[in-house]
Curated annotation (Swiss-Prot):
GO terms for cellular component: cytosol. This is Alanine racemase, catabolic. SMART domains: Ala_racemase_C. CDD domains: PLPDE_III_AR_proteobact. It catalyses: L-alanine = D-alanine. Keywords: Isomerase, Pyridoxal phosphate. InterPro entries: Ala_racemase, Ala_racemase/Decarboxylase_C, Ala_racemase_C, Ala_racemase_N, Ala_racemase_pyridoxalP-BS, PLP-binding_barrel.
Amino acid sequence: MTRPVVASIDLLALRQNLQIVRRAAPGSRLWAVDKDNAYGHGVARVWSALSAADGFALLNLEEAILLREQGWKGPILLLEGFFHADELAVLDQYRLPTSVHSNWQIKALQQAKLRAPLDIYLKVNSGMNRLGFMPERVHTVWQQLRAISNVGEMTLMSHFAEAENPQGIVEPMRRIEQAAEGLDCPRSLANSAATLWHPEAHFDWVRPGIVLYGASPSGQWQDIANTGLKPVMTLRSEIIGVQNLRPGEAIGYGGLYRTTQEQRIGIVACGYADGYPRVAPSGTPVLVDGVRTTTVGRVSMDMLAVDLTPCPQAGIGAPVELWGKEIKIDDVAASSGTVGYELMCALAPRVPVVTL
């Protein structure tokens, strides 16, 4: 018998989310960021629902090639660029724009034999200090790239570390303006948070990611609750066991939760091997038979326990929503000390996925 845990992907919600996000930046073109296999939703499964985007921004060649083979003919941007010089031949074959953030990549472009120039996204380090050239170096690097016959259209790109904060882009924007002074070029700066909350950063291309999937870039659902955005992924299971416990009984590994009164406990077929966070504490929200309740005790590999006190009608086979339309993934993540991004990406391969 198949375990009842399943993830469903709502493609209509995904299409509608794209429309909402596009309206937030009406003057910009839009990269749909689909890194890490579309935030765990599956690139092959969801790309057609995002085909109204102007392009897809991905992390690796395998996903880019998959999109091409699935029929996408528009732009595909490699956000971290190419990792080895010999990959440039593949970028050339599939016509993939690439970010450039290191000196060795410039040298590789100089030496490559390509059929046609590649469009380049020059990465500026505006303060996150991961990838990119410091602002004071950008003019020099720009001129180096402009002199390479393998380089086509160039765009300045950067990434904000704190765009969820009202003042979080002030200093990065100053650095970007410093880098761009005197350069007549397109820019791509805005991630999900900046797309929603910082129109001054929209420029030519925005790059929304997590918001397309109905979760908040700030990690707080209330920050996007009034936007119309809807969760795309729902993780469901069922009650597979019920325990009627006396006061003082321990639940789960380590006995972290003990009953203080007679309590009815439901056992759900879902655990950390399915992608549910092991660190989720007692009190993490969950929906059982349409009623909001909480987890109790430590999450096991294949199971977790829930309090059935608010839903006395629930028994074996009662439906459980771990996250989705009613139980927001941001709330589960916040309870677990993490972010919705991580939970989406951690969905285990053993969990069946259906599309709606």
